[in-house]
Amino acid sequence: MKSLITQVTRSGQVESFHVGYGVIVDASGEIVKAYGDTQYSTYVRSSAKPLQGMAVLRSGAYDNFKMTPEDLAVICSSHSGEPIHTQTVSQVFSEAGIGPELLACGIHPPIHRPSAQALQTAGVAPQQIHNNCSGKHAGMLATCVQLAHSPEDYLNPEHPVQQYIYDIVKEYTSSDEIHRGVDGCSAPVFYLPLQKVAMAFARISKQENQECCQIFQAMSGHPHLVGGEGRFDTALMKSYPEKILSKGGAEAVSAAGFIMPDGQVYGLAVKVLDGNYRAIGQMVLK
């Protein structure tokens, strides 16, 4: 099976290239197309966020706190820290009756350069809410409130909410056990074969139950909240309105689910082996 290759050229000559693996499957996990090692395992990083976000739905937090599809989109996001993103994350906290001081995701400036510059000009230091993972963490904390669990140490893999999320990820990837590490935002991260990641996205995109419908429609219907200006996931979902669910992650991993014109639904997962994110868009589009 041929691997995916993305070339970088200069003045008509190849200067560099990146190699990746990829797989397309249906909702049962049957392989439709393979590029390289479909069983290659990697940390799925932020590509897991649609599955992690399901905890808000399954726990009842979404309904109880009267959340909106926009809230759900930002809970599943790696947002750029634009005002619309931080406002929506703040709204999630307000609806759950808690504050952003509970966040334990760490601080970095907004990915969106104009937003970062605006903070600097105003003399305002970045806060945890500007972290691209703050929406995911807000969803985890709202789930803590809903299930009456303490938010203290909410990122510990043994915390009841992390166990709750772990069970969801195992369910959608048909896995008995999954090795977990620590993500860049300190949350647990899942080490999975590409085929299983693609299958999970196919299942969500097939909208086989209410929670899948809500995740797919929230993210594909509000692509700007999932990423932001100039972001690949946002651009891809905007190009095919409500037909694609796309979520990338650090170290050049990406997953998507898509609905074909004939109604068939597939999922894909791609990993650039050297972790260079500049190649991921081309590989996904191939």
Q: Which stretches of residues belong to each language-model region?
A:
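Bacterial peptidoglycan biogenesis and beta-lactam-recognition machinery
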Residues: 57-65, 96-101, 148-153, 159-180, ...
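Active-site-adjacent helix/loop patches that line small-molecule binding or acyl-intermediate pockets
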Residues: 68-177, 203
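Short Gly/Pro-enriched turn/cap motifs at secondary-structure boundaries
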Residues: 11-14, 130, 243-248
